[in-house]
Amino acid sequence: MSALEETQSLCKQVDDICNNGMESVEQCNKLLDQLSKIPMSIEIIQKTNIGIKVNMMRKKVTDDAVAKRAKNIIKDWKNVVDGKSKSQDDGGAPPAKKHRKESVEEAKPEKKKIEAPYKRPEPSSRPEIVAQFASASFPPKHLENDETRLKSAQLLLSALRFGDMPQGTLDPEELAVQIEEKLYSVHRDTNKSYSAAVRSRIFNLRDKKNLALRENVLTGVVRAEKFATMTSEEMASAEIREMRDKFTKEAILEHQMSVQQGTPSDMFKCGKCGKKNCTYTQLQTRSSDEPMTTFVFCLECGNRWKFC
C-alpha cells in the first residue's frame, strides 16, 4: 500500500472519530502512531486534507496528552509545507536528487556554492495547503467558548500577520494569545475599555507609518505583555511623537505669552470687543526662515489671539 493510500485509509478512521464520537485514547494514539510513520509529502497533504481532519480530531478528544501529540504532528506537517523539514533542507528536492546535485558540484569546483538565506513562503503560495494548518494550534481551548475574546485574538493575529514577516519572527499565534490574555487580565472583563484597548493595538500594528512597532513585537524586542499595557503615546511612531511634542511646546509657549506683559499698542483691534487697547509679543516659534508669531492680548476683555 502506498503512502497516499495508507493516508486515505487513516483519514476515514479519523472521520469516524470526528463524526460519530467513537474516540478513545487508545484508538487515537494508534492512529497517530500510524500517521507519524508515513513519509508525508505536500501532495499527500493536499489530496487528503489530513491536516484539517487531524486538527478536528484534536479538538474533539478530551485527553490533553492526545491533543498535544496531534498538535505536534500537525506542526511537523506544516514544516513540510513550509519547506523546513529535515528531509527537505535543500529546498524540497528528494534525497536522491540531492546526492546527484552534490556530485555535479564536486565535479565543478570552480563554481562556488552560495547558499541562499531562508525565505519565508508567501501566504498565498499554497493557499489550499496552508489553510489546513491555519488553526492547528490556534485558538487555544480556553478561548473557544468566549466569542468576544476569541474574536479579539483572531483580529490581533491578523494584525500581526499584516505585511512581510521580519527575520527572527516569533510564533504570531502565541503572541496574539499572550497579548489578549494580558489585556483581559488588565481590564478584568470584555468591557468597553477592553474592546478599546484591542482596537488601539490592532490599529497601531496595521499602521504602515509605524512598521517598527509591529516588527519589535514580532521579534520580541517589545514583549507581548508589555505591548498589551503600552499607552497610545508609547505605541505611536517617531513622527507622531515629534508632532505631539511640537504641539505641546507651542501650547505651553502660547499660554506663557498670554500671561506675560507685552508691548502696549493700538495697532490691533480686538475681534471680540472692538477695542484697540492691546499688548503684543513676538516670538520665533518656527524655523528661522519663517515669519515670527505675534501674540496679542486685549486689556479690555481678556481676549487672546495670535497670527504670523
Swiss-Prot record:
<comment type="similarity">
    <text>Belongs to the TFS-II family.</text>
</comment>
<dbReference type="InterPro" id="IPR006289">
    <property type="entry name" value="TFSII"/>
</dbReference>
<dbReference type="Pfam" id="PF01096">
    <property type="entry name" value="Zn_ribbon_TFIIS"/>
</dbReference>
<feature type="binding site">
    <location>
        <position position="270"/>
    </location>
    <ligand>
        <name>Zn(2+)</name>
    </ligand>
</feature>
<feature type="region of interest" description="Disordered">
    <location>
        <begin position="82"/>
        <end position="126"/>
    </location>
</feature>
<feature type="binding site">
    <location>
        <position position="298"/>
    </location>
    <ligand>
        <name>Zn(2+)</name>
    </ligand>
</feature>
<keyword id="KW-0805">Transcription regulation</keyword>
<keyword id="KW-0862">Zinc</keyword>
<keyword id="KW-0479">Metal-binding</keyword>
<protein>
    <recommendedName>
        <fullName>Putative transcription elongation factor S-II</fullName>
    </recommendedName>
</protein>
<feature type="zinc finger region" description="TFIIS-type">
    <location>
        <begin position="266"/>
        <end position="306"/>
    </location>
</feature>
<dbReference type="InterPro" id="IPR003618">
    <property type="entry name" value="TFIIS_cen_dom"/>
</dbReference>
<keyword id="KW-0238">DNA-binding</keyword>
<feature type="binding site">
    <location>
        <position position="273"/>
    </location>
    <ligand>
        <name>Zn(2+)</name>
    </ligand>
</feature>
<dbReference type="GO" id="GO:0008270">
    <property type="term" value="F:zinc ion binding"/>
</dbReference>
<dbReference type="InterPro" id="IPR003617">
    <property type="entry name" value="TFIIS/CRSP70_N_sub"/>
</dbReference>
<keyword id="KW-0539">Nucleus</keyword>
<dbReference type="InterPro" id="IPR035100">
    <property type="entry name" value="TF_IIS-typ"/>
</dbReference>
<dbReference type="InterPro" id="IPR001222">
    <property type="entry name" value="Znf_TFIIS"/>
</dbReference>
<dbReference type="InterPro" id="IPR036575">
    <property type="entry name" value="TFIIS_cen_dom_sf"/>
</dbReference>
<dbReference type="GO" id="GO:0003677">
    <property type="term" value="F:DNA binding"/>
</dbReference>
<dbReference type="InterPro" id="IPR017923">
    <property type="entry name" value="TFIIS_N"/>
</dbReference>
<comment type="function">
    <text>Necessary for efficient RNA polymerase II transcription elongation past template-encoded arresting sites. The arresting sites in DNA have the property of trapping a certain fraction of elongating RNA polymerases that pass through, resulting in locked ternary complexes. Cleavage of the nascent transcript by S-II allows the resumption of elongation from the new 3'-terminus.</text>
</comment>
<feature type="compositionally biased region" description="Basic and acidic residues">
    <location>
        <begin position="102"/>
        <end position="125"/>
    </location>
</feature>
<feature type="domain" description="TFIIS central">
    <location>
        <begin position="148"/>
        <end position="263"/>
    </location>
</feature>
<dbReference type="Pfam" id="PF07500">
    <property type="entry name" value="TFIIS_M"/>
</dbReference>
<feature type="binding site">
    <location>
        <position position="301"/>
    </location>
    <ligand>
        <name>Zn(2+)</name>
    </ligand>
</feature>
<dbReference type="GO" id="GO:0006368">
    <property type="term" value="P:transcription elongation by RNA polymerase II"/>
</dbReference>
<dbReference type="GO" id="GO:0005634">
    <property type="term" value="C:nucleus"/>
</dbReference>
<dbReference type="InterPro" id="IPR035441">
    <property type="entry name" value="TFIIS/LEDGF_dom_sf"/>
</dbReference>
<dbReference type="Pfam" id="PF08711">
    <property type="entry name" value="Med26"/>
</dbReference>
<keyword id="KW-0863">Zinc-finger</keyword>
<dbReference type="GO" id="GO:0006357">
    <property type="term" value="P:regulation of transcription by RNA polymerase II"/>
</dbReference>
<feature type="domain" description="TFIIS N-terminal">
    <location>
        <begin position="5"/>
        <end position="84"/>
    </location>
</feature>
<keyword id="KW-0804">Transcription</keyword>
